[in-house]
Structures are given as C-alpha cells and as structure tokens.
Amino acid sequence: DGNAEEAAKNEAATYSLNAANSALDDVEDNIVATTPFTHLELSLGSDAFGLDTTGTTTKTELLGVLRLHETKNTFVFNQTSISSFDSRTTANLGFGVRHINDDETVIMGVNAFYDYELDSEHKRTGFGVELLTSLLEMRANKYNAVSGTITHDGINETALDGHDIKITGNLPYFYSSNIYFKQSEFKDGAGYKTENDEWGFEAEIAPNVTIGIAQQKDGNNTKDTVASIRYSIPLGANTAPTKAKQDGKWSTSLKPIREK
C-alpha cells in the first residue's frame, strides 16, 4: 500500500505515537460491528523524535478499510486515510484486491491510490503490487505526480514521480521480527533526483512495542545509521486476539498467513 510512503524529505521519518484517548476503543468497536468497515483507526500522537520543525508537534491520522466484496479467496477493499503532520494535511483514497490461495499460505495483491495535500494542493496517483508469505514479503509501488510546480508559503515545490520496492524476510523471534531491504527513487523531470537504499531490522519486543535499526545510503553514497522505537495501541484492542511470542524455530515451510 502507497499510503505510508512520503516522497523526498519524509523518506526516513519514524514516529513514536503515544495514545491520547483509550476510550475511543468503544467508538471503533460500534462502527465496525454495524458497517462494512473491517478496520478503523484513529491515532493521536506526539513527535517524540523532533522531526517536525514547524512547531506543530502532534501527528493525527484517521484510517479506515472498507470491505467492498469478499469471498473465501478474494478480498476487494477501499482504504481511505487523512493525516496531519509537519503543518501539512494529506488525504489518501485507495482501492485494492487481495487473493489468498486455498492453503492460505500465499497472498497476492494489487492496489491503486490517489494522494491530495490539502494545503499545497499537490496531487499524486500511484499503484502497487504485493506478494506475501510467512517467510518473505515483497512490495512495490509506482508514484505519478499529477500537479506540477506550486508556490506554497513562498517556496516553489514540485511533486515528484518515483517508485519504491521493499523485500522483507520474517524471523521467528519475539512477537514478530524481520530484516528488510528497501530501495526508492524520486525525480521531478527537470534533473533533480533523490535515491535511497535502506537495510534494516525490526523486532516487536513486547506487544505493540517495536524497535528498529537501519542503515541508509543516498545517491551520493552518504551513509547514516538510524534507530527507532514505536509504541502503538490499536483501537478496539479488546477484541483482538492476544499476541504470543514466536517459538524461535526456523522453518522453510510456508505457514498460513490469513491473520496478516
């Protein structure tokens, strides 16, 4: 899904979100129980890493996944979100299809999406593909700038075309863990281009607490090592199954992944 990816400056951004109101659980449960929504999440958090330099330290995101059609093997959905951070508000509208095989060991998916930044009026379309198993996950997204150069707050900004790919190897440790490689490239058609390669490790060391470490390299071969910690409390958590640690046993056999 392209919704979480930001071109250029937000490529390496990692946020620590702190729950603001656990009473919202009840609101989400009621909506999900009475509508085709399969997932509804409202996140209110703080910029614990000081990434926002404009003075707005709160990140807010509302995300919903709406079931459009579902069979034993196929799931057609709409994913819509609106997020506000760094004094910018972005709306995303996406549609996707996922297919799972009869053994529930392989998921293949495609999606298309549209991004609109409310303040600058930048627009972007895109599409993505994904292949998911219990051992490996592969995702790729293509982004197409719709808006050209726009003057926003006295600065000329140009939307970027680009792509990213991510390959993830799942590990049998902690509550979940993985190693991954991600490559991205964005350009404006006038000679500007930004590239980034990233290798990393992530581990959910406690329920909803994930740590990560990664090395990033840009097109000038400048390397940077970053560490992060992420804490999240999913809305409606009282209806979710209790998480259990993995057994640490390696296996080359594909396991059912429908719960993903």
Label each residue range with its predicted role.
Residues 58-71, 89-103, 125-142, 161-172, ...:
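Feature captures outer-membrane beta-barrel proteins of Gram-negative bacteria and organelles
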Residues 1-34, 39-42, 145-180, 184-191, ...:
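Flexible, glycine-rich linker and terminal segments associated
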Residues 3-117:
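Outer membrane beta-barrel translocator domains of Type V secretion systems
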Residues 38-50, 74-84, 107-117, 127, ...:
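Transmembrane beta-strand segments that form the barrel wall of outer-membrane beta-barrel proteins
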Residues 48-60, 82-92, 116-123, 157, ...:
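Solvent-exposed loop/turn segments connecting transmembrane beta-strands
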